[in-house]
UniProtKB/Swiss-Prot annotation:
PROSITE patterns: PROKAR_LIPOPROTEIN
Position of the signal peptide: 1-16
Protein name stated in the entry: Flagellar L-ring protein
One biological process term in Gene Ontology: bacterial-type flagellum-dependent cell motility
Database matches in Pfam families: FlgH
Lipidation, N-palmitoyl cysteine type: 17
Topology relative to the membrane: Lipid-anchor
Superkingdom in the source lineage: Bacteria
Function: Assembles around the rod to form the L-ring and probably protects the motor/basal body from shearing forces during rotation.
Lipid modification (S-diacylglycerol cysteine), residues: 17
UniProt keyword list: Bacterial flagellum, Cell outer membrane, Lipoprotein, Membrane, Palmitate, Signal
Molecular function GO labels: cytoskeletal motor activity
């Protein structure tokens, strides 16, 4: 009895730790940053000259260096649907008869053996045979569909410039309304050529995009099941 209680407690704590880890990963999305940004560099005006070697006179005001900012226009929409159907049928029959047995007739030259109480006596011919049939049917159907959409705007910081010139960006936004916190996190890689003249870029052009939109507060708590229900769902075998 003690072993059973100990095993149940171990399963309970493992399931609880798993749930807490999943919640912690979502809430701490983007914290700390995956990439470590370089410290900002102060620009010092050149003495005796109006020319700055940090930027070109005809350079666009677009993000291209570490700690530069770029605005991401998030407009993600996904839709998937899959249908599967399987039908299988199998029908077989078997009929075997024995005519000779080691060169002898199956009646062993004994005729007129009557069948009395399940045994052959005089009056019937011994003629063994095997006959059987089998039928198997299977049918299965499945249908699944999923749709998701997220829109918004977030300004990200360039945290790294890759050797090929692509920019690694990362951003995190928190909005609190009536003790309800909404967290929007975005990470990814963009090309400088995809940035518009207004220093904006569509989320469709973000490679390896990781977009998290989670909420914390009373509404979020009401939308999630209690810890005991989640634990029972994990161990319930039926």
């Amino acid at each position: 009895m003690r072993k059973l209680i100990l095993i149940s407690l171990c399963i309970f704590f493992l399931a609880s730790c798993s749930e807490l880890q999943e919640v912690r990963d979502i809430k701490n999305a983007g914290m700390p940053p995956k990439y470590y940004p370089e410290p900002p560099q102060t620009q010092v005006a050149s003495e005796g000259s109006l020319w700055r070697n940090k930027a070109s006179l005809y350079e666009d005001k677009k993000a291209r260096r570490v700690n530069d900012l770029v605005t991401i226009l998030i407009n993600e929409s996904t839709s998937a649907q899959k249908t599967a159907s399987t039908t299988a049928s199998r029908d077989s029959s078997t009929n075997y008869g024995l005519d000779t047995f080691f060169g002898m007739n199956t009646d062993f030259n004994i005729h007129n053996l009557p069948l009395i109480n399940g045994f052959y006596k005089a009056g019937n011919v011994f003629s063994p045979s095997v006959k059987g049939s089998a039928t198997s049917d299977f049918k299965g159907d499945g249908d699944t569909a999923r749709t998701g959409k997220i829109t918004g705007t977030i300004t990200a910081k360039v945290v790294e410039v890759l050797p090929n010139g692509n920019l690694v960006i990362e951003s995190r936004k928190e909005v609190i309304v009536n003790n309800e916190k909404e967290i929007l996190v975005l990470r990814g890689i963009i090309r400088p050529d995809d940035i518009s003249q207004s220093n904006t870029i569509l989320s469709q052009y973000v490679a390896d995009a990781q977009i998290y939109l989670v909420g914390e507060g009373t509404l979020g708590d009401k939308q999630s099941q209690g810890w005991l229900v989640r634990f029972l769902d994990k161990i319930w075998p039926f």
